[in-house]
């Protein structure tokens, strides 16, 4: 047998080859009629592959001695195992009208072998010199991949002295020439020429693997290892994948240690041949003698199979395969489809699925619903011009400290295998997108993936999003909308895919969220970033006795009983299968849903332009696209193939509760209300037939101690009502001031009574009141608002207190109504 450039017979290896060939011929499953690996040959023909995948559990069941020999000395027996596979293929290719795997035109074509399902999965830290040459499986996260290059496997060399040709010189992980010419009269040892046409090359790729976060001991940095991929398994592992590599550990020369400047450069001064001759210095001549001169080696892993740890179906939550082609639907077994249909038929299934999201966190149903829709996502579309329309949903959570924001991010990063969790404060622009690094061996520049690239077809969770620097926030603008990353550095110009959903968490600027201010004043995020989020949720930590009791009871129960305290309707595995099945659906918009979408968008735009209303950010076309994505995600959650109007209405409700609910904060005016009931309003102000009052004062809240002591009821109105009345009064006072300035006659301010009468008449003309009682309550609120604007906010000032009447019982009332009010010159309308 020919091996390693010489002729010798390895009897043990030959026996292993024969036993393995017998295994391929005879092994059958329990109820199978034909041999298992004859069926594997059919699969190889169908995919035009030259790699035979062997389940190592089958080898263990067939012959224990064979599995022990392969496990202990895999590197020694690997050429013989490949030869056994080739013999098996050659035997099976005759006698049938099938396309042969090895044709007559290429009889020297090799069959590669790939083992999987190794019982003992090693950790990356456990790989040492004791594992060299053994068959091992190791799991890690791919962080960098090189380009695919040709590698010389077996070289054919020509002797430059005598012209003799030496074939099949196997390369020992470095450029290996024949030791000596086979011609007995030549004795050449160094002068060789490589015949590339007769040599054997294969595809080669180097992958950088890093141990998973769960395997890193406390206080340690993550270890990394280079993995060598050959043949058909190149490009099977992408950056960000959690992968199981099966292969063996080898020792390879450390190029970096040999080429470090000033450390191991060897020089030799030859003796001068003549008296006046000068010495000649000779340094390192290249990499031909690599590993010979220096005992500098490092460990690497040569893989023969690549297997995604959690299954490609769960990794690719975007329902796109490795090549990004989403035309093929995933295949599901009948049992899986029956289970999904059973979950769909459970009463109130949608709320139960929402409750199954992050069960350790109590409440926050809206945020859990948003995370579910983000996991489902919308339908990815491509226009005729080739423009990609984003189907991924971005969610931002803004809230006070200790509101479980990070818990939601950790849960989402854990349920989706292809996900990245990072912190905005410690992440740079290059760390989030991509950076250009230099290859240590070749010196060429390559692209190293950042967090968004590692989360391609997954979810990127960014905590402390508001703590990022401005220059780093700008870097993710393109990734959030176009879902690409453009790089022009070091002579490399590339556009990379970053098809990821972003789940971000941010804290308010003042430590606590101020409900009296819009979102843009509470979060240090520019409008360009905020508009790219489909949903923005506010989490406010307000004391509430009932809610606090349930939260405390839930947390104590989780600490006491651990998993027993959590009883979600569906387990995490069931939830993953349901999401995977729902993502295989591509719902289409119906004509009725289209009409509802257009009407809803017009209504939202109208509300954005109405004076006195304050939304989190401007309504743009991005919000219309967000409505479409949310509607498609809701249709997927119901396993519908058509988007119905009910789905659109639910999406509109979600959008409103996420970005407009911030306005519904309350303003307490109990300290500013007057003792009277406002009965001095002219009688003609309660006429007309108006409809329902827009924002009535809330009288059913808990009593305020100070108000109770003085015999007053608590007066609470909505923030929207407060802002609307404030802006109307200020605008009226400004108009009056401008008219007085223009005419040059009269007082610059208005009487408080005249101002109140003007506002009530304006509202009455619009049909805002249905009874005299509502008018009285409105006047009471306006008086309290004016008092707050004067005493606390300082937006209004009193020019003249007015003349006090002689009657004692009406003095205070008429004095309050007769005082002259004006706008503070320093106040600017927002």
Curated annotation (Swiss-Prot):
Positions of C4-type zinc fingers: 159-186
Keyword Zinc-finger found: yes
SMART domains found in the cross-reference section: MCM (SM00350)
Signal peptide from the UniProt entry: none
Subcellular location: Nucleus
UniProt keyword annotation of Translocase present: no
Positions contributing to ATP binding: 399-406
An example Gene Ontology CC term for this record: MCM complex
Predominant place of localization: nucleus
Full protein name: DNA replication licensing factor MCM6
Species this chain originates from: Oryza sativa subsp. japonica
């Amino acid at each position: 047998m020919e091996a390693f450039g010489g002729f010798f017979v390895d009897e043990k290896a030959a026996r292993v080859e024969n036993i393995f060939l017998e295994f391929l011929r005879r092994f059958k499953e329990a109820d199978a009629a034909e041999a298992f690996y004859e069926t594997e040959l059919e699969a190889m023909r169908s995919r035009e592959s030259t790699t035979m995948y062997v389940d190592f559990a089958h080898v263990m069941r067939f012959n224990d001695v064979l599995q022990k020999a392969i496990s202990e000395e895999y590197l020694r027996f690997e050429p013989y195992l490949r030869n056994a596979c080739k013999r098996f293929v050659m035997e099976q290719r005759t006698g049938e009208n099938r396309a042969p795997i090895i044709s007559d035109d290429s009889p020297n074509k090799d069959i590669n072998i790939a083992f999987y399902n190794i019982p003992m999965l090693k950790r990356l830290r456990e790989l040492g010199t004791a594992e060299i040459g053994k068959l091992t499986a190791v799991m890690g996260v791919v962080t960098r991949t090189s380009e695919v290059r040709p590698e010389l496997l077996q070289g054919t060399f020509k002797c430059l002295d005598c012209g003799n040709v030496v074939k099949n010189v196997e390369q020992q992980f470095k450029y290996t020439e024949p030791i000596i010419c086979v011609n007995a009269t030549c004795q050449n040892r160094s002068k060789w020429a490589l015949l590339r046409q007769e040599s054997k090359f294969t595809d080669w790729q180097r992958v950088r693997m890093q141990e998973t976060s769960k395997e890193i001991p406390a206080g340690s940095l993550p270890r990394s290892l280079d993995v060598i991929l050959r043949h058909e398994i190149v490009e099977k592992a992408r950056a960000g994948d959690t992968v199981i590599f099966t292969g063996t550990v080898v020792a390879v020369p450390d190029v970096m240690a040999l080429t470090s400047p000033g450390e191991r450069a060897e020089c030799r001064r030859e003796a001068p041949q003549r008296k006046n001759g000068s010495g000649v210095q000779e340094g390192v001549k290249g990499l031909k003698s690599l590993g010979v001169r220096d005992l500098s080696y490092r460990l690497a892993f040569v893989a023969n199979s690549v297997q995604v740890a959690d299954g490609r179906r769960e990794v690719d939550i975007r329902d796109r395969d490795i090549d990004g082609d989403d035309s093929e639907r995933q295949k599901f077994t009948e049992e899986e489809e029956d289970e999904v249909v059973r979950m769909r038929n459970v009463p109130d299934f949608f709320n139960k699925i929402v409750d199954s999201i992050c069960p350790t966190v109590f409440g926050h149903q809206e945020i859990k619903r948003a995370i579910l829709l983000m996991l489902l996502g919308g339908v990815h579309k491509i226009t005729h011009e080739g423009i990609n329309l984003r189907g991924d949903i971005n969610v931002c959570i803004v809230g006070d400290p200790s509101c479980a924001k990070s818990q939601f991010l950790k849960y989402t990063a854990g349920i989706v295998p292809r996900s990245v969790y990072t912190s905005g404060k410690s992440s740079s622009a290059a760390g989030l997108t991509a950076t250009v690094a230099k290859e240590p061996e070749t010196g060429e520049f390559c692209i190293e993936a950042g967090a968004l690239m590692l989360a391609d077809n997954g979810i990127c969770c960014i905590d402390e999003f508001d703590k990022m620097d401005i220059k780093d926030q700008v870097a993710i603008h393109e990734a959030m909308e176009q879902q690409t990353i453009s790089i022009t550095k070091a002579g490399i110009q590339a556009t990379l895919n970053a098809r990821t959903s972003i789940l971000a968490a941010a804290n308010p600027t003042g430590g606590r969220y101020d409900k009296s201010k819009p979102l843009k004043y509470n979060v240090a995020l520019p409008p360009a970033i905020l508009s790219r989020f489909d949903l923005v949720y506010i989490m406010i930590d307000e004391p509430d006795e009932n809610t606090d009791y349930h939260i405390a009871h839930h947390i104590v129960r989780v600490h006491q009983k651990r998993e027993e305290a959590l009883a979600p309707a569906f387990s995490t595995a069931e939830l993953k299968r349901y999401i995977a099945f729902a993502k295989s659906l591509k719902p289409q918009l119906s004509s009725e849903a289209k009409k509802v979408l257009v009407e809803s968008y017009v209504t939202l735009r109208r509300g954005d332009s109405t004076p006195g209303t304050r939304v989190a950010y401007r309504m743009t076309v991005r919000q219309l696209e967000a409505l479409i994505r949310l509607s498609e995600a809701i249709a997927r959650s119901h396993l519908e193939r058509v988007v119905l109007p009910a789905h659109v209405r639910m999406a509109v409700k979600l959008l409103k509760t996420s970005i407009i609910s911030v306005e519904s904060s309350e303003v307490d005016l109990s300290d500013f209300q007057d003792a009277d009931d406002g009965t001095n309003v002219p009688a003609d102000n309660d006429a007309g037939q108006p409809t329902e009052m827009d924002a009535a004062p809330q009288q059913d809240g808990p009593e305020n101690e100070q108000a109770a002591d003085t015999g007053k009821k608590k007066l609470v109105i909505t923030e929207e009502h407060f802002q609307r009345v404030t802006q109307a009064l200020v605008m009226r006072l400004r108009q009056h001031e401008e008219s007085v300035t223009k005419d040059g006659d009269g007082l610059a301010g208005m009487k408080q009574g005249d101002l109140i009468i003007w506002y009530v008449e304006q509202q009455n003309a619009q049909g805002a009141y249905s009874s005299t009682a509502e008018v009285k309550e409105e006047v009471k609120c306006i008086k309290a608002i004016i008092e707050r604007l004067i005493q606390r906010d300082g937006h209004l000032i009193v020019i003249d207190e007015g003349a006090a009447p002689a009657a004692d019982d009406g003095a205070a009332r008429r004095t309050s109504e007769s005082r002259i009010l004006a706008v503070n010159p320093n106040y600017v309308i927002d």
